[in-house]
């Protein structure tokens, strides 16, 4: 059985980890970085760039470069959070037929899980390159405060990427696993995981206990805000720059998509710099132009100014902390350790506020960018049966219930209930001779169902005629370890029942997921063909170069006819190298290799005559051997070709 990898699918950055024995290993991607920007670019020629290459070209291709898509996953178009993002994002967010928020790229509508799948596919490939084997199973993390629709959509993204998602695990819980397993402290400890990432905020109170040599991680409570994170901090800086520039030059940059993309990059850099310096300068020449000519942007921002701009955002994280402490039934003084997760927790003001609330310094021995992926890998090891000394007890973040008479939300499973869990309750009909009941399932904390998120509905039909209140209908709720809900309803008199796995009131249908999986496979086939074409092109160019070099040195030793034949073969190969026909390139490579055999023999004979066989090896390669190898894909050239291929990609 292959390894189960751990993936932190982040709003801004993603990370992949595996376990080597009992040691976690965060894997570097093809660009050599341990985290990958969650950015996807759709190019004009159909190529899809993911990560750093996508980020590098964002300024020139803002409408087709997607970032922060996790903020849309599992959400309806009409939700106020989505509406807020529509005005801020350079790309188009549109309404799908099922009411979900989708994205439009190059005249094509795409679902957020389909886009996130591109990032997951890169994470999968990163792990496969390192392990040297195919990876098919993963544990993927989500914010603890993600609702059922968002969890289901994340699982769908995994499937589209070709992964069997063994478990969806909450990010703070994963970070606690990463923290707790390498600590040798004995006895029970309560920890707070404060997770402020690129797009979401979570706080979890977790108890780590030693039970018969086994470490038990029990989540006592969780709270958060799935629309608060580093992207919002960046936006405050962008708005400030736009305002200052307008005051100074009279030009409004908010409608200039290219300028906005440059501002976003500059804002993110400034925010990061201000975590370690007191002042930074934003310098963007030629940001725009008007009738008077080009305009340049130059602005100094101090740490104090940034803190003033985002003060209320940081304050918004404290109320969920208060609620989580109360729900866990503990006091702030009971917390042994505070762990900071997510890139935004590097901001000194955030650390100060956390210290102020919890009354203690946060631990500095946890990597905020990598802890979540490491925890996911540990959970993967547990699920794979390779680790028996860990037990993880997570919770459902929000209450679940059904709508009953008068539009009331009758809660079946309360928030912070340990999962997996089951619960059933008996209900009856509201009208005489009612033949069917509609079960509407909601998630949230409001008293009235309409104030909560509707997850789905289904009917139980064929109820025998009876006065209202007589039929006995048992409704059962079952939450699995992924936090995904299964609901059933049964008429006790007839034994008739109906069950559903809640597939959000919208979400992707099975057929849509299958289509996206097929699309992804087709893309992979296209990528493979493109890669093979580039390989052939590189080999062809290398052969032209080496043959020309040998011809310059030894051409005078050939008969005129032989030399003409080689030069004609070089020209033929150069002509086909301009095109995209792999078969034609391969054929001309073979033809040049054959034509230059005589040249190779001359080179070799000359070297032997001089007794310099070693020195001649390189030149001999220009003849028959180099030609033949290039024609048949020389294995020793693979690494060189890889590097050249990436370089080509990055410049697109």
Swiss-Prot record:
Induction: By stress conditions e.g. heat shock. The modification Phosphothreonine is found at residue 200. Residues 610-652 are annotated as: Disordered. It holds the Pfam family HSP70. Keywords: ATP-binding, Chaperone, Nucleotide-binding, Phosphoprotein, Stress response. It comes from the Bacteria. Residues 643-652 have a biased composition (Basic and acidic residues). InterPro entries: ATPase_NBD, Chaperone_DnaK, Heat_shock_70_CS, HSP70_C_sf, HSP70_peptide-bd_sf, Hsp_70_fam. GO terms for molecular function: ATP binding; ATP-dependent protein folding chaperone; unfolded protein binding. Residues 611-634 have a biased composition (Low complexity). Belongs to the heat shock protein 70 family. PANTHER family: HEAT SHOCK PROTEIN 70KDA. Acts as a chaperone. This is Chaperone protein DnaK.
């Amino acid at each position: 059985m292959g390894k189960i990898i751990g993936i932190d699918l982040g709003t801004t950055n993603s990370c992949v980890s595996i376990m080597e024995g009992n040691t976690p290993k965060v894997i570097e991607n093809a660009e050599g970085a341990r985290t990958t920007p969650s950015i996807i670019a759709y190019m004009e020629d159909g190529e899809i760039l993911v990560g750093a290459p996508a980020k590098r070209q964002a300024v020139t291709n803002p409408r087709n470069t997607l970032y922060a898509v996790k903020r849309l996953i599992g959400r309806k178009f009409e939700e106020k959070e989505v509406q807020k993002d529509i005005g801020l994002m350079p790309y188009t967010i549109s309404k799908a037929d099922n009411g979900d928020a989708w994205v439009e790229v190059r005249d094509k509508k795409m679902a957020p899980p389909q886009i996130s799948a591109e990032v997951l596919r890169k994470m999968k490939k990163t792990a496969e390159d390192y392990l040297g084997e195919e990876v098919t199973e993963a544990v993927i993390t989500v914010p603890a405060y993600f609702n059922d629709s968002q969890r289901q959509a994340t699982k769908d993204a995994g499937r589209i990427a070709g992964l069997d998602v063994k478990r969806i695990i909450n990010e703070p819980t994963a970070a606690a696993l990463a923290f707790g397993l390498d600590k040798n402290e004995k006895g029970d400890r309560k920890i707070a995981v404060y997770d402020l990432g690129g797009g979401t905020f979570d706080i979890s109170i977790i108890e780590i206990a030693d039970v018969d040599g086994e470490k038990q991680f029990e989540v006592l409570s969780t709270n958060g805000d799935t629309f608060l994170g580093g992207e919002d901090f960046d936006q405050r800086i962008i708005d400030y720059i736009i305002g200052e520039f307008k005051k100074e030059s009279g030009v409004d940059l908010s409608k200039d998509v290219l300028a906005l993309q440059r501002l976003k990059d500059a804002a993110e850099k400034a925010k990061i710099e201000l975590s370690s310096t007191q002042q930074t300068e934003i310098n963007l020449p030629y940001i725009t132009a008007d009738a008077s000519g080009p305009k340049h942007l130059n602005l100094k921002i101090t740490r104090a100014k940034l803190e003033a701009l985002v003060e209320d955002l940081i304050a918004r994280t404290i109320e969920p902390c208060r609620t989580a402490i109360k729900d866990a039934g503990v006091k702030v003084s009971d917390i042994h350790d505070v762990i900071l997760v997510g890139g935004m927790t590097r901001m000194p003001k955030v650390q100060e506020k956390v210290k102020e609330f919890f009354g203690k310094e946060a631990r500095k021995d946890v990597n905020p960018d990598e802890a979540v992926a490491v925890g996911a890998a540990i959970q993967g090891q547990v699920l794979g049966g390779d680790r028996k000394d860990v037990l993880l007890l997570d919770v459902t973040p929000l209450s679940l219930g059904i709508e009953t008479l008068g539009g009331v939300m009758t809660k079946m499973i309360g928030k912070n209930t340990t999962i997996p869990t089951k619960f059933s309750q008996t209900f009856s009909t509201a009208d005489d001779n009612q033949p069917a009941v509609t079960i509407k399932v909601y998630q949230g904390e409001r008293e009235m169902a309409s104030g909560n998120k509707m997850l789905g509905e289904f009917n139980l039909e064929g109820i025998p005629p009876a006065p209202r209140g007589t039929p006995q209908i048992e409704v059962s709720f079952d939450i699995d370890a992924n936090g995904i809900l299964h609901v059933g309803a049964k008429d006790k008199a007839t034994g008739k029942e109906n069950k559903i796995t809640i597939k959000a009131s919208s979400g992707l249908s099975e057929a849509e997921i299958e289509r996206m999986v097929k699309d992804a496979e087709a893309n992979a086939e296209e990528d493979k063909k493109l890669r093979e074409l580039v390989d052939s092109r590189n080999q062809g160019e290398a052969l032209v170069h080496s043959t020309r070099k040998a011809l310059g040195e030894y051409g005078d030793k050939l008969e005129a006819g032989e030399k003409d034949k080689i030069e004609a073969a070089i020209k033929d190969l150069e002509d086909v190298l301009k095109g995209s026909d792999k078969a034609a390139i391969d054929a001309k490579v073979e033809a040049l290799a054959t034509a230059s055999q005589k040249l190779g023999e001359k080179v070799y004979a000359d070297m032997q005559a001089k007794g310099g066989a070693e020195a001649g090896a390189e030149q001999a390669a220009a003849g028959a051997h180099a030609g033949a190898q290039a024609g048949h894909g020389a294995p020793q050239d693979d690494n060189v070709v890889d590097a050249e291929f990436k370089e080509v990609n990055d410049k697109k």
